[in-house]
């Protein structure tokens, strides 16, 4: 959050003191500095953790930072569409891991969820192109969940 606070302060100062192209350039510079800092931190953080944790534990930390959305989403898709192939499951997992990496860098919970939302849309498009009727799959899934006493 410090990275975002620095960016916000610079943007606020630029908007209060500059005009025109100078203001736009200062705002863009603040965004670029934020992106560069996030890029560094994104790789420094797991590297520092690796001194004390193994890969599985680092993934658990990443999942904690992103509210466990990766596995909830993956398990939901696998439960919703029991006929998914191993290839389809692997593609879904790959996209969700990518989403988690972006979500880790997001500045708040809404933006973390938005990162996953983008990839959920990508997954839905992928599955639809592969011939799955997602509306029908969701309806059948809801029936199965209800039959076993659960809720969605």
Q: What do these predicted regions represent?
A:
Residues 1-152:
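Charge-rich (acidic/polar
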